[in-house]
């Protein structure tokens, strides 16, 4: 799938030390070949992969698959990094953003949860600021790429752009539209995506007292999520110091020069690994509050 292809691309770009690559998929894909750095690897089934006792297994196959198979890989001694939401809320499972809380991991952590994409980019900017100024509240509105929905959504946009009837990933047209629903609704009126931003932010930063409220919107963009983030701190801050802190944060690139119209945009963030932060300014309507524009 799309996510697996991008994972392989990133592993290759970063020259991740791979002795042997084991592509794993459902039975219908077993036997197919995957190209990685010029070498062909045959796709194997789940049980075969478990029996091969790999060092690391990266899961991106949905929650049900992860709940069934991640424990089997872990029992065989494999460290599982799971991209689904299946393990994120489990109290005994770590929710990890390496730049923030990788130091909490131990050899006993055999199933490691990967946070939601929109959460990762936000907490990378928030975590160092929380250490300095103590965050009280976060208000975030997201403008999320259709790639988060998958190949079907990309095809829907392409069809609508070309004026062709086809399968719909969404209940409504996405071309020239903005849909204020990412994932299904929960009983409180928020979507699952919005509640991930709430719960995961608190868990990763390690502070349940941080109040978070979110509105997640799907927009007709292919690649790159954007977020308008308002942060209220317990302590006052200096905007120049905020820029300096973010400038020295691993995984963050500050693009914030109004004289040259420099600010983050999803078009230019696509295919890059960093989180881009700009439009950094004091919220003049509320004490100790800051506005940022975060793109990744």
Task: Describe every region a protein language model picked out.
Residues 212-296:
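C-terminal active-site/capping subdomain that shapes the small-molecule cofactor and substrate pocket
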Residues 133, 205-206, 233, 250:
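A broad structural signal for alpha-helix termini and local helix breaks/kinks
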Residues 1-174, 210-211, 244, 256-286:
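N-terminal Rossmann-like NAD(P) cofactor-binding subdomain of oxidoreductases
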Residues 27-29, 117-118, 142-149, 178-185, ...:
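Glycine-rich beta-alpha junction loops
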Residues 177-222:
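Oxyanion-binding "anion nests"
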Residues 106-113, 177-187, 289-294:
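Helix-loop-beta segment of a Rossmann-like dinucleotide-binding subdomain
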Residues 8, 198-202, 243, 247:
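Generic solvent-exposed, charged/amphipathic alpha-helical segments
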């Amino acid at each position: 799938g799309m996510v697996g292809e991008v994972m392989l691309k990133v592993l290759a770009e970063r020259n991740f030390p791979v002795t042997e690559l084991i592509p794993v998929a459902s039975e219908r894909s077993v036997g197919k070949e995957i190209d990685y750095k010029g070498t062909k690897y045959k796709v194997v089934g789940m049980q075969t992969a478990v029996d091969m006792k790999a060092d690391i297994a990266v899961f991106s196959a949905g929650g049900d698959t992860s709940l069934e198979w991640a424990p089997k890989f872990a029992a065989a001694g494999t460290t599982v990094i799971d991209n689904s939401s299946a393990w994120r809320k489990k109290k005994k499972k770590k929710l990890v953003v390496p730049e923030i809380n990788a130091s909490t991991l131990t050899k006993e952590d055999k199933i490691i949860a990967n946070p939601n994409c929109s959460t990762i980019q936000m907490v990378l900017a928030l975590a160092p600021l929380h250490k300095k100024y103590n965050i009280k509240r976060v208000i975030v509105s997201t403008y999320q790429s259709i790639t988060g929905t998958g190949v079907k959504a990309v095809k829907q946009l392409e069809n609508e752009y070309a004026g062709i009837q086809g399968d719909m990933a969404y209940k409504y047209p996405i071309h020239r539209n903005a849909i204020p629903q990412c994932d299904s609704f929960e009983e409180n009126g928020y979507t699952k995506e919005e509640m991930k931003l709430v719960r995961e932010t608190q868990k990763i930063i390690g502070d349940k007292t941080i109040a978070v409220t979110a509105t997640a919107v799907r927009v007709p963009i292919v690649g790159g999520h954007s977020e308008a983030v308002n942060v209220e701190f317990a302590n006052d801050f200096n905007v120049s110091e905020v820029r300096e802190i973010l400038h020295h944060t691993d995984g963050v690139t500050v693009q914030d020069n109004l004289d040259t119209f420099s600010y983050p945009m999803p078009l230019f963030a696509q295919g890059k690994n960093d989180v881009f932060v700009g439009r950094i300014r004091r919220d003049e309507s509320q004490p100790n509050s800051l506005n940022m524009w975060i793109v990744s």
